[in-house]
């Protein structure tokens, strides 16, 4: 398979100027290699030829997985009816072996004196850059393995006596994952007790008593209980007059605790939180001798043990409603509120003067709220003998915020994360583009960005009023970020005689994206010289196009010349809501066969027009596909 990133290949292809050099030059008699085209980006640096990048290496990977499970089940009715013992043991061994083969491409260009404008079809080429290789080289074989051992033993009890139903479960679990020698271990107990009376009154209690090796003794195990209850209102006698309209109505709610022992890992916390980590020869030491000619490295504490570390915890509350109307319409509505606390994070409020060089302490102090509502709907009805119509829909709204986050002592409240959404848009408030030098001279100082401010650059609002544009002037531009708060979908299915039609739409709302880090701003990421997007080339600020509302500020030769324009600001924030015509299918049924035509990703509607609003500008685009097929039934 390919030995490269598909996204990188797409970016190189997307950003390489197609007229700078050809992908290849014609082969000559006796050639033992492909003549890839290229050119000098600088005195010694070549461009990236996407075809050469794709063709220069590949890899072969072999995976082996051994998965063995054994379970035993024993009914214990001789003790009490409905009691059962189950034991499960699972062992999985996974291994990977990988090697790659590669060659160094040969690059060529048209020589400076090797062509004539009068006869452009005739030219001479010359080799550039380091010599390539005519033969493929092979890497060493790389092997990786891991093993997982899992054990659980459980007692189940289920029994119905008259109008009472009772079930219970008690389980012990142990898991060990071993990779790179050091194992990961978890163990714990869990249980569940469920009761219902007349299928109308429902109650459940469950718990987990879980342990992790990441924490110190005394804190490794924690108890996580949860309770839930439900009431089938439509089962009551007083509801009978309503059964013709609402034949099922259930109210349900739950509250409980859930724990996670992976807290802090994504942010860089140590695996064993209760241990100090010390590095030798890490750049800290002392010198001695009359002339300071002797130096010795000393130990450096790179991670401090987390005192009294605990499990991260989520307090989850849900309340829901399930309704069925006219035996046709099913509606489920659920509200949820999660309070996540004990989030492990570094103490940003501790100043460096306290002596924490590489070992800023961690603490279980973060708190985050997440709440929202979920709605799902299904409806189906046979309108007349030959025609049936069905509809489905779903809607989700979620919002979150930092309840508490340890932060530095900021001078202004708008710099704080606490009390604000996690996924918000932050940046400078843009006030348009500078029209001339006189306006620049009268504007608050913008030298902190490092480039010479010129007409056509973006001007920013001085929020703190100190006469300078600095990071203290960055504010929350929108509570909505690139993760939508609202996601929804709806569809229809129709059957008429032997024809059937189905379609589905999905979309998102309350979503913004920031497009400041796009070409040509990110030129250094790939080739250093890239194409301009059409919308930029058609409407950027210039002396010949001094529009105060141009869609793009002035251009520069290098990124450093326009660094003030690349920062996040309201100038670059865009509404990325969208509605997508996701799928469509038309079918016709014969006695033993159904033929169909379907399509995927048929259309998208959005106020954002530059590219697919669900993707980023350099992402591989979603394909629009059509299929014709047949399904046979015998």
Regions of interest found by a model, annotated:
Residues 1-102, 110-423, 427, 568-634:
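Extracellular/periplasmic, surface-exposed regions of secreted and cell-surface proteins
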Residues 95-98, 262-263, 438, 502-504, ...:
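Short helix/loop capping segments that flank catalytic or ligand/cofactor-binding pockets
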Residues 267, 382-482, 522, 533, ...:
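Conserved small-residue
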């Amino acid at each position: 398979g390919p030995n490269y990133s598909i996204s990188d290949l797409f970016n190189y292809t997307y950003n390489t100027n197609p007229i700078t050099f050809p992908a290849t030059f014609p082969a000559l008699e006796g050639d033992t290699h492909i003549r890839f085209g290229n050119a000098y980006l600088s005195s010694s640096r070549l461009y990236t030829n996407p075809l050469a990048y794709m063709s220069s290496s590949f890899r072969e990977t072999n995976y082996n997985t051994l998965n063995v499970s054994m379970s035993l089940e024993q009914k214990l009715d001789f003790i009490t009816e409905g009691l059962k013992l189950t034991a499960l043991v699972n062992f999985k061994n996974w291994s990977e072996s990988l090697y790659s083969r590669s060659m160094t491409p040969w690059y060529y260009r048209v020589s400076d004196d090797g062509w004539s404008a009068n006869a452009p079809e005739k030219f001479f080429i010359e080799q550039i850059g380091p010599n390539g290789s005519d033969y493929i080289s092979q890497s060493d074989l790389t092997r990786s393995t891991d093993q997982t051992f899992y054990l659980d033993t459980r007692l189940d009890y289920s029994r119905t006596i008259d109008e009472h139903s009772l079930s219970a479960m008690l389980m012990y679990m142990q898991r060990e994952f071993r990779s790179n020698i050091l194992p990961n271990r978890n163990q714990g107990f869990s249980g569940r007790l469920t009761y219902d009376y007349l299928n109308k009154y429902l109650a459940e209690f469950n718990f987990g008593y879980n342990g992790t090796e990441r924490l110190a003794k005394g804190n490794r195990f924690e108890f996580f209980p949860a309770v839930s209850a439900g009431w089938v209102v439509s089962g009551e006698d007083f509801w009978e007059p309503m059964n013709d309209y609402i034949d099922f109505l259930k109210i349900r709610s739950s509250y409980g605790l859930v724990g996670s022992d992976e807290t802090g890992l994504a942010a860089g916390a140590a695996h064993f939180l209760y241990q100090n980590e010390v590095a030798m020869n890490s750049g800290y030491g002392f010198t001695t001798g009359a002339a300071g000619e002797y130096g010795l490295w000393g130990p450096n504490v790179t991670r401090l043990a987390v005192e009294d570390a605990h499990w991260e915890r989520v307090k989850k509350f849900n309340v829901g409603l399930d309704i069925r109307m006219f035996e046709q319409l099913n509606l489920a509505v659920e509200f949820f509120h999660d309070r996540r606390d004990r989030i492990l994070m570094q103490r940003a409020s501790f100043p460096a003067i306290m002596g924490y060089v590489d070992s800023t302490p961690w603490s279980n102090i973060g708190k985050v709220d997440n709440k929202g509502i979920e709605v799902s709907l299904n409806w189906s009805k046979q309108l007349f003998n030959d025609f049936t119509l069905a509809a489905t829909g779903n809607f989700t709204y979620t919002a979150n915020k930092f309840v508490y986050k340890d932060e530095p002592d900021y001078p202004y409240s708008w710099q704080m994360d606490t009390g604000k959404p996690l996924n918000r848009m932050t940046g400078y408030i843009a006030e348009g583009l500078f029209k001339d030098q006189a306006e620049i001279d009268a504007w608050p100082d913008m030298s902190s960005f490092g480039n010479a401010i010129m007409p056509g650059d973006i001007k920013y609002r001085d929020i703190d009023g100190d006469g300078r544009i600095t990071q203290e002037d960055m504010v929350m531009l929108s509570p909505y970020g690139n993760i939508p708060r609202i996601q929804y979908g709806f569809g229809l299915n129709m059957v008429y005689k032997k024809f059937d039609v189905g379609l589905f739409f999905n979309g998102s709302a309350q979503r913004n994206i920031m497009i400041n880090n796009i070409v040509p701003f990110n030129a250094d990421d790939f080739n250093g010289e890239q194409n301009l997007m059409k919308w930029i080339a058609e409407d950027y600020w210039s002396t010949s196009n001094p529009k105060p509302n141009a869609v793009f500020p002035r251009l520069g030769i290098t990124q450093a010349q326009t660094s003030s324009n690349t920062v996040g600001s309201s100038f670059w924030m865009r509404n990325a809501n969208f509605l997508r015509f996701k799928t469509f299918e038309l079918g016709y049924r014969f006695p033993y066969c159904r033929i169909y035509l379907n399509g995927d990703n048929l259309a998208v509607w959005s106020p954002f027009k530059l590219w697919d609003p669900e993707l980023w500008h350099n992402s591989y685009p979603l394909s629009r596909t059509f299929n014709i097929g047949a399904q046979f039934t015998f």
